[in-house]
């Protein structure tokens, strides 16, 4: 008997998620370090790389969503997984060529710029493939295959996997990257890349098996006549959909610098608050730990209050804790700094809980034929918020002016509460399929 036949469909989906996320997190963690090995002291090179990846993904996101809706599931999974595979493989090749060129004294060569752009474009393709796979698994296969009464439990396990890989994969990747021969400083990068490549193979066969066993090869497809049609995006139609206000409420939370994982907050704590790196690192690690609490609190409140009410309570909790955090921040004393950081950690319970709720509401409410379009719109809005936030951060004349971003962050979270309450008050009883009530 095949091993795959012994695993439930839900288990196969979760295992596929674990494989892809662990590799993605490890690769993303070491890429900036590898760039700094090749270009020591040039932090702007790593920043420029990620800017290209973010902008490229931003531009291609709407088209990828429409493409998902116009193609069979098996084809979507195949393209998503193998696009990542060949993009990571290309990235390894370009890293090796860049390192060889720089070692040979070719810093002034035109080929250096060409290889760097090629590396960044491979990063865009890897990001796009990851996004296609995430939407296919989390926003299409999961709501189609997982029983409605099990969906909250399934999503909680998805979140646990995401948080576990967010913490564990970088630790393992950092250890691999640190140990290398002197003659081959990127040996760790290549090992991590190989780990990533190997993980794509079982992931693809797991997802293909899920689709074939479930009989979901055929889905309601949106008509698309050509590639030109795929790249013609009707954003006005997406924005006018009622689900947009749900998506917007979540995207507003990405306009916040009040995150343990935020680059801007970490820089402020180091430069202005003079906190040691060990405390900042502990703060970052605890952020994921507090996020795990939501994987217990959210399902519990769903059983007690229903999906929408649980989402409201978690989002409201985030607003209250960040309100206290910003009040402590405004006081400016040494003790209040730790109150500020403690409340940010508590707010992660609310943030991740609401994230679970918003994710499940999209799973239940978006019709099959528009899952790619509207879920890619969600990615588009969160990416836009990230770009806006970093653009605002780059315009700050002094580190101390970071306080304005803190106040804007609180305003964005409170506005998210208003938007979600207004949207959810019009929903009544949310159903999945024909008659599975979400509110109890």
From Swiss-Prot:
It comes from Bdellovibrio bacteriovorus (strain ATCC 15356 / DSM 50701 / NCIMB 9529 / HD100). Residues 1-8, 70-72, 146-147, 214-242, 305-306, 366-370, 425-440 are cytoplasmic. Its cofactor is Ca(2+). Changing residue 84 to E: Complete loss of calcium binding. Keywords: Cell membrane, Membrane, Metal-binding, Transmembrane, Transmembrane helix, Transport, Zinc. The cofactor facilitates a conformational change critical to the transport cycle. The binding of Ca2+ from extracellular fluid activates the transporter by triggering a conformational change that enables the transition from the open outward to open inward states. This is Ferreportin. Pfam families: FPN1. The chain crosses the membrane at residues 9-38, 43-69, 73-103, 110-145, 148-176, 187-213, 243-271, 277-304, 307-329, 336-365, 371-395, 399-424. It is a multi-pass membrane protein. One of its GO terms (cellular component) is plasma membrane. It is found in: Cell membrane. Residues 39-42, 104-109, 177-186, 272-276, 330-335, 396-398 are extracellular. The keyword Zinc applies. Belongs to the ferroportin (FP) (TC 2.A.100) family. Ca(2+) binds at residues 24, 84, 196, 203. GO terms for molecular function: iron ion transmembrane transporter activity; metal ion binding. Iron transpoter that exports Fe(2+) from the cell. Also binds to Co(2+) and Ni(2+). May act as a multivalent divalent metal transporter. The transporter is composed of 12 transmembrane (TM) helices organized into N-terminal (TM1-6) and C-terminal (TM7-12) domains. The substrate-binding site is formed at the interface of the two domains and is alternately accessible from either side of the membrane. The transport cycle is viewed as a series of ligand-induced conformational changes that include open outward and open inward states.
């Amino acid at each position: 008997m095949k091993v795959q036949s012994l695993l439930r469909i839900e288990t196969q989906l979760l295992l596929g998620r674990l494989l892809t996320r662990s590799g993605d997190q490890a690769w993303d963690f070491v890429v900036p370090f590898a760039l700094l090995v090749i270009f020591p002291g040039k932090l702007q090179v790593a920043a420029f790389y990620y800017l290209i990846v973010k902008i490229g993904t931003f531009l291609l996101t709407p088209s990828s969503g429409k493409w998902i809706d116009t193609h069979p599931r098996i084809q979507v999974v195949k393209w998503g997984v193998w696009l990542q595979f060949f993009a990571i493989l290309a990235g390894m090749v370009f890293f090796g060529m860049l390192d060889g060129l720089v070692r040979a004294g070719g810093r002034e060569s035109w080929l250096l710029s060409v290889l760097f752009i090629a590396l960044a474009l491979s990063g865009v393709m890897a990001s796009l493939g990851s996004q296609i796979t995430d939407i296919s698994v989390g926003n299409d296969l999961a709501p189609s295959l997982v029983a409605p009464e099990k969906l909250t439990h399934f999503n909680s396990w998805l979140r646990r996997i995401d948080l576990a890989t967010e913490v564990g994969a970088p630790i393992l990747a950092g250890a691999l990257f640190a140990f290398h021969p002197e003659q081959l400083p990127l040996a760790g990068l290549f090992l991590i890349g190989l780990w990533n490549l190997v993980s794509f193979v079982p992931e693809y066969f797991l997802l293909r098996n899920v689709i074939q066993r479930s009989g979901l090869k055929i889905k309601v497809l949106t008509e698309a006549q050509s590639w030109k049609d795929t790249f013609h995006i009707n954003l006005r139609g997406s924005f006018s959909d009622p689900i947009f206000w749900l998506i917007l409420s979540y995207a507003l939370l990405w306009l916040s610098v009040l995150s343990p994982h935020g680059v801007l907050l970490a820089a402020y704590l180091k430069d202005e608050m003079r906190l040691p790196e060990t405390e900042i690192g502990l703060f970052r690690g605890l952020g994921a730990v507090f996020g795990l609490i939501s994987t217990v609190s959210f399902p519990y409140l769903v059983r007690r209050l229903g999906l929408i009410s649980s989402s409201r309570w978690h989002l409201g909790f985030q607003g209250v804790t960040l309100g206290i955090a910003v009040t402590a921040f405004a006081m400016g004393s040494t003790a209040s700094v730790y109150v500020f950081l403690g409340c940010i950690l508590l707010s992660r319970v609310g943030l991740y809980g609401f994230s679970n709720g918003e994710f499940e509401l999209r799973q239940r409410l978006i019709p099959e034929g528009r899952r790619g379009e509207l879920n890619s719109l969600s990615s588009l809005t969160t990416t836009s918020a990230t770009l806006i936030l970093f653009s605002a951060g780059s315009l700050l004349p002094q580190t101390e002016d970071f306080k304005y971003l803190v106040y804007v962050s609180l305003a964005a979270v409170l506005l998210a509460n208003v938007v979600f309450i207004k949207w959810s008050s019009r929903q009544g009883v949310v159903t999945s399929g024909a008659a599975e009530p979400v509110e109890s």
